[in-house]
């Protein structure tokens, strides 16, 4: 079940625009980027999706000369499908192939009749060279970046069947909010704080109403998040990042001295890990 997101309108406006630069959809893992693009794909007659993480070998299509005609031919052979004018081409997990990021420039310059969206997480590490030791030749001015986030409270209300309350929230200035409406908003907000804004958890709550099931989803997401720590930097071990992450989650809103926060972790590495975690989000 796809729950409508606020970004859907932005993506649709991009489709309708005469000058549609390739899009880079950025955001933390599992915030709904892929689902949003697949939902948009229903507005296109032809759609091709390639995932550079699931199919690492497909990245070879972008090796060598970035000749768009040759790249399109390779894609057509790979998918056994013609790529004609108006096709939506979705390059998912593009951070796995820096060369594909550079290629977006030439999609814009040489094949403007195609609609191209790239999505990825941890892109900041690739763009500054922290992952591959070499900064990416980013196509400045030839692409448009959009940041996607987890569900907002308004999106949560719409997704859980509280459309009337969501519309009320959108149009009220809270100067004359009836007590019953205010109380209902508070109750729903408490639920939102518990369920969170990750799409899988919101979908689970909308379908089952089970907070316990949502908490299991949260645990799975955190484990997956930690599994990515080895991708953050070659200059700090994943174990140190994990220690700082665990420390931070238990000291929210508290004052901390980085020099004495965690035994065995210097102020330099503590601050470095905090910066890496912020960049990942």
Residues covered by each model-derived region:
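N-terminal pre-Walker A segment at the start of P-loop NTPase domains
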Residues: 1-16
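Structural recognition of the conserved hydrophobic beta-strand(s) that form the central parallel beta-sheet
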Residues: 90, 115-121, 147
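Interdomain hinge/linker elements that couple catalytic modules in large macromolecular machines
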Residues: 158-281
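Short regulatory helix/loop adjacent to the ATP-binding pocket of P-loop NTPases
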Residues: 124-144, 157-162
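Hydrophobic positions on the alpha1 helix immediately C-terminal to the Walker A/P-loop
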Residues: 36, 40
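Short glycine-rich substrate-engagement loop in P-loop NTPases that contacts/grips substrate
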Residues: 54-85
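Conserved lysine of the Walker
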Residues: 33
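Hydrophobic anchor at the beta1->P-loop junction of P-loop NTPases
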Residues: 25
């Amino acid at each position: 079940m796809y729950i409508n997101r606020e970004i859907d309108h932005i993506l649709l406006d991009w489709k309708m625009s005469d000058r549609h630069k390739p899009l880079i959809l950025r955001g933390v893992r599992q915030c709904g980027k892929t689902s949003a693009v697949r939902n948009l794909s229903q507005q296109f007659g032809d759609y091709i999706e390639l995932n550079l993480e699931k199919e690492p070998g497909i990245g070879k299509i972008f090796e060598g000369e970035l000749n768009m005609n040759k790249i399109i031919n390779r894609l057509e052979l790979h998918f056994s499908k013609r790529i004609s004018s108006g096709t939506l081409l979705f390059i998912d997990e593009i951070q796995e192939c820096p060369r594909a990021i550079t290629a977006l420039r030439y999609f814009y310059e040489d094949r403007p009749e195609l609609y191209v969206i790239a999505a990825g997480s941890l892109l900041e590490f690739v763009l500054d060279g922290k992952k591959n030791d070499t900064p990416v030749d980013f196509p400045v001015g030839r692409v448009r970046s959009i940041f996607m986030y987890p569900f907002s409270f308004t999106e949560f209300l719409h997704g859980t069947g509280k459309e009337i309350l969501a519309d009320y929230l959108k149009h009220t200035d809270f100067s004359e909010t009836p007590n019953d409406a205010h109380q209902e908003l508070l109750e729903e907000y408490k639920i939102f704080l518990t369920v969170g804004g990750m799409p899988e958890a919101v979908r689970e709550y909308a379908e089952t109403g089970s907070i316990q099931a949502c908490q299991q989803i949260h645990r799975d997401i955190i484990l997956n998040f930690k599994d990515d720590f080895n991708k953050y930097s070659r200059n700090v071990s994943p174990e140190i990042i994990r220690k700082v992450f665990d420390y931070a989650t238990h000291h929210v809103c508290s004052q901390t001295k980085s020099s004495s926060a965690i035994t065995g972790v210097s102020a330099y590495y503590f601050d470095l890990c905090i910066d890496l975690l912020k960049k990942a989000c």
